From Swiss-Prot:
Protein known as: Membrane protein insertase YidC
Gene3D superfamilies per record: 2.70.98.90
Entries under HAMAP family matching the protein: YidC_type1
GO MF entry, a single one: membrane insertase activity
InterPro entries from the UniProt entry: Membr_insert_YidC, Membr_insert_YidC_N, YidC/ALB3/OXA1/COX18, YidC/Oxa/ALB_C, YidC_ALB_C, YidC_periplasmic_sf
Coiled-coil intervals: none
Domain of life: Bacteria
TM helices/strands, residue ranges: 9-29, 375-395, 449-469, 507-527, 546-566
Length: 609
């Protein structure tokens, strides 16, 4: 009876895990989509109908003018960007930051592969850039620089972490514009714009900043990850607009103080970080010219009236780079990973990394893995060590759980007697059983608690592996070169001995891409199942026989780091449960149960005549 209850509970928990995963990846996205549509409709209704003045709009080069990235860079005068993590240039035409490579990150695990391209100039296939400046008040005739204005560099030399650059433009009508750009040793640009009025009358200008991206980017397509426009906008808090969502809304505006906004990918982002005291008219928008869509995050600050002989100025910042947790920052109690979030006094800038709804578990999971990575120098080993710690933390609960189940085994004679007394009265039987459990201080469902508590651990580790750049291209040993990617080996081509890729087979490909680690995980799960006697109920037996096979196929496409965790967790569970069983005087039947499987298979073979 005890083993039947335990097996039933485990089956329920595993089935619940599958249902939770289904809810997490399929049902919730639809609910979120409906909620987002309502939110967009509400936001549009309360947004100002017309910013004053109009926000800058993206330029749309003719389709025939599209050129290669290198050609576009070479045909405009530029100031070089050269820092330990960034390489690129500032276009003097428009004074845009539109050429940026992340030199510490490569497109593939091959260190000789190209560096990640973040920004690309207008005229290429996928322009992506940041622009800053001034907008004249409605009705004003003041001529301000735009995307076609050619600026001049004061002095010479590249923009480095120790040498800012200053650009200048004189409109010939009494207004002189200067822009000083500095960059730190990570991904933060600081931009100071000044305008001096030597004309004959005061002039009113609005400071602006924008990030513009042409073309709809390829996204991962997973609900657990946001890719698109993002911002933490004062009292309106975190705002996330996928490309599809902003296509439907067209434009949404927000009046905010102490906000930031930008565009985020899975691992990279560009974000505008205005002064925390600035009053902003922030906006997300989607525009279309021909077949090309343009996505833009921008803001206008309050107007500045510059008197004759006076100077107006504004400061802003641009984050453009990798979403490294230590650089962006982590807002979590008792943790000193402040990054830009703390350094600049920003409002929840750590949410640029999509920690998810269960951030209170995901963040500690990442911090633990990151700590042990710095101890061992390998994220795979860090995963193994953190799993051991989790097992140690849950050990008292697991011990009490199995002790309770041992008591259940001790009262089985009483339960059997009750079944004989009440063969047809199920309600009375349950009442009497509960009385026995209460008297003996037995919790009949305690056996599933350790497994239930593992579910949030599983999902938090999956989230960390999937969204954090620290896990990207992080190797383990042997053939695992990237813990955030699925195991690259395939059993159906004999792990590379046969010259074809099973995952490329039409329709069946995703089901044939089963690597070595998913198989190891399935074997460890099978041993864990065999730690308990075979259930007498045929349905339970069928579920438990097929569960390791099902999970092997399910986890084959998951990150290798997660599969390694599950396999290691199964192994530790077998060791831990065997220890607890012996400690409670229960015989460990693992080897006998395994042998019985093969004995049954042998006995099923037809006898030789």
């Amino acid at each position: 009876m005890m083993s039947e209850n335990r097996n039933t509970i485990i089956a329920i928990v595993l089935s619940g895990l599958i249902l939770i995963a289904w809810q997490y990846f399929y049902n919730i996205p639809q609910m979120e989509k409906d909620r987002a549509a309502q939110q967009a409709q509400s936001q549009t209704a309360k947004s100002p109908t017309e910013p004053t003045p109009n926000s800058p709009k993206p330029d749309h080069p003719a389709a025939e003018s599209v050129v290669a990235r290198g050609v576009a860079i070479a045909t405009t005068p530029r100031v070089k960007i050269d820092t330990p993590r960034l390489s690129g240039s500032i276009s003097l035409k428009g004074a845009r930051i539109d050429d940026l490579l992340l030199t510490k990150f490569r497109e593939t695990v091959d260190p000789a592969s190209p560096a990640i391209e973040l920004f690309s100039p207008s005229g290429t296939t996928t322009p992506y850039y940041a622009e800053f400046g001034w907008v004249a008040a409605t009705g004003s005739t003041a001529r301000v620089p735009d995307q076609n204005t050619v600026w001049q560099q004061e002095g010479s030399g590249a923009l480095t972490q120790s040498t800012p650059v200053t650009l200048k433009y004189d409109n010939g009508e009494g207004l002189t514009f200067r822009r000083t750009i500095a960059v730190d040793d990570h991904y933060l640009f600081t931009i100071k714009d000044e305008v001096t009025n030597a004309g004959g009358a005061p002039v009113t200008l609005y400071p602006f900043a924008l990030i513009s991206r042409h073309g709809t980017p390829a996204v991962s397509g997973y609900y657990i990850l946001h890719e698109g426009l993002i911002g933490y906008l004062g009292d309106q808090k975190l705002q996330e607009y996928s490309y599809k969502k902003i296509d439907e809304a067209k434009s949404v505006s927000f009046k905010v103080t102490n906000g930031w906004l930008g565009i985020t990918d899975k691992y990279w982002a560009a974000a505008l970080l205005p002064d925390t005291s600035a009053q902003l008219q922030a906006r997300f928008s989607s525009n279309e010219s021909g077949s090309v869509k343009t996505y833009q995050a921008d803001y206008l600050e309050d107007a500045q009236t510059i008197p004759v002989g006076g100077t107006g100025s504004v400061n802003t910042r641009l984050f453009a780079g990798a979403k490294e947790a230590g650089v962006v920052g982590i807002n979590f109690p008792f943790v000193e990973l402040g990054g830009y979030n703390k350094q600049l006094g920003l409002n929840h800038f750590d949410l640029l990394i999509d920690w998810g709804w269960f951030y209170f578990i995901t963040k500690p999971m990442f911090l633990a893995l990151d700590f042990f990575f710095h101890v061992f120098g390998n994220f795979g080993i860090a995963i193994l060590f953190v799993t051991v710690l989790i097992k140690a933390i849950f050990f008292p609960l697991a011990n009490r759980s199995y002790a309770s189940m041992a008591k259940m085994k001790a009262v089985q004679p009483q339960i059997a007697a009750l079944k004989e007394r009440f063969p047809d009265d199920k309600m009375k039987l349950q009442q009497e059983m509960m009385e026995i459990y209460k008297k003996e201080k037995i919790n009949p469902i305690s056996g599933c608690l350790p497994m239930v508590l593992q579910i949030p651990v599983f999902f938090s580790l999956y989230k960390v592996l999937f969204v954090t750049i620290e896990m990207r291209h992080a190797p383990f040993f042997a053939w695992i070169k990237d813990l955030s990617a699925p195991d690259p080996t395939h059993i159906f081509n004999l792990f590379g001995l046969l010259p074809y890729d099973p995952s490329a087979v039409p329709l069946l490909g995703p089901y044939l891409a089963i690597g070595a680690w998913p198989i190891i995980m399935g074997i460890t799960m099978w041993f864990q199942m065999k730690l308990n006697p075979t259930p007498p109920d045929p349905t339970q037996k069928l579920i438990f026989d097929w569960m390791p096979v099902i999970f092997t196929f399910m986890l084959a496409a998951f990150p290798a780091g997660l599969v390694i965790y599950w396999a290691w967790n199964n192994t530790l569970s077998v060791i831990q449960q065997s220890y607890i069983m012996r400690r409670n005087g229960v015989k460990v039947e693992l080897l006998n149960n395994v042998k019985s499987v093969f004995r049954r298979k042998s006995s099923d073979k037809p006898a030789k005549t």
